[in-house]
From Swiss-Prot:
GO terms for cellular component: cyst wall; extracellular space. This is Bradyzoite pseudokinase 1. It is found in: Secreted. Residues 1-26 form the signal peptide.
């Protein structure tokens, strides 16, 4: 047993060393968009003034290199162009500089219930947003792998529309001393967590439709999510359910790295699941149908949570048994092992579960799946 453990540690060390050497060689030999001398296959990067895709209203940069063609130097250049934030002027953010709050992967999320005056000014928060608070999604700046630090800010500033009703909005993206930040409205909680506490009042039909419409809106932008689960969805202060966790998103039809590391049970069976594939963090088989599979697993978990009494007795009337049964049948179709046998998003929207719903209203963010106002978790 001890020898096996030692061999596995040696294998892990070897793989990580190989990844590090690959990164270093990429730095040494990769094209540098700043000087343009080695850019035969790519157009030059030129910063043009434009409104940021985030809600902060600050100026963003528009890159001509497609996301799938971004190189090490492209990400490094983009990291340098992120607007600065002075953590020392924000007491809660200042505590992050010690590094003790970061997880092992160099990330964390911090809730700022009472934003400091400097943060209010920086994010141009309205009085209502000040009262509701904000959250900060934080990542350590990794100079050996700048994409890790700046990938999600890039999506919000360059790809996602300024207003997308069913995607978690950004209030601004910044670079600090050694951390990058994305600020979001402070939500009431994550859908999975809210259901597990038994303090929620969900309309199952509307909630499931909202989740389908949110995924459709992401696919319409040409992006896969690749890591959907119940807690990928947040409930905003106004009751809207939005899709977040976009750091795992990638263009449809491309082979790109997925930075979340090991996969859970939500991953479609056609995705590589062997030990070395997980270590390499390289997944090349994600498709629209693999997102459908993950959403189907989320639906199955939703049925289990609500069907096992994880809601208060006063909520029982808000959860219709026939909707749970229809959702269970739909989830079984979505988690078929063969991708070709899974329904498309359009076919899912026509399922009997959603009979009588107006998906146009749902796609515009008018639905409120949780019927009663809840306190934050």
């Amino acid at each position: 047993m001890a020898n096996t453990s030692v061999r596995r540690r040696q294998l892990l060390s070897s793989v990580l060393l190989l990844q590090w050497l690959t990164t270093v060689l990429g730095v040494a030999w990769g094209p540098n968009p700043i000087d343009g001398s080695k850019h035969g296959q790519f157009p030059s990067l030129r910063r043009t003034e434009g409104v940021s895709q985030s809600g902060s209203g600050h100026k963003g940069s528009v890159y001509r290199i497609p996301l799938a063609d971004m190189t090490f130097w492209s990400w490094m250049s983009y990291l340098k162009e992120l607007p600065d934030i002075d953590e020392s002027r924000n007491p809660i953010l200042k505590r992050l500089l010690s590094g003790s709050f970061l997880r092992r992967d160099g990330s964390t999320t911090v809730n700022v219930r009472v934003p400091a005056r400097e943060l209010v000014r920086l994010l141009s928060l309205t009085p209502e947003q000040q009262r509701e608070g904000v959250s900060a999604k934080v990542r350590l700046i990794n100079l050996l792998d700048p994409k890790y630090s700046v990938y999600e800010p890039y999506l919000y500033r360059e790809i996602l529309p300024k207003r997308s009703p069913l995607l978690l909005p950004s209030l601004g993206e910044y670079r600090g001393a050694f951390l990058t930040y994305i600020f979001h409205p402070l939500s009431k909680g994550l859908v999975g967590d809210m259901l597990e506490t038994g303090r929620s009042h969900p309309d199952v039909q509307v909630l499931a439709a909202n989740m389908v419409a949110a995924l459709k809106s992401l696919h319409n932008l040409g992006l896969l999510h690749r890591s959907i689960e119940l807690n990928s969805f947040s409930v905003l202060p106004d009751g809207t359910v939005v899709l977040g966790g976009l750091d795992t998103a990638a263009p449809i039809g491309t082979e790109t790295r997925l930075w979340v590391g090991f996969f859970g049970q939500e991953t479609a069976p056609e995705i590589d699941r062997n030990f070395l594939a997980d270590l390499a963090l390289t997944q090349g088989r994600h498709t629209v149908k693999s997102d459908v599979y993950s959403l189907g697993v989320a639906f199955r978990n939703l049925v289990q949570l609500l069907g096992n009494g994880n809601i208060g007795p006063e909520d029982r009337g808000a959860v219709r048994q026939d909707h749970l049964e229809l959702l269970d049948k739909l989830s079984q179709k979505m988690i078929e092992e063969e991708p070709g046998n899974r329904p498309t998003i359009e076919e899912i929207m026509k399922d009997p579960l959603f009979e009588g719903l107006n998906f146009e209203d749902i796609e515009e963010g008018k639905a409120r799946p949780f019927r009663y106002k809840q306190n934050r978790l």
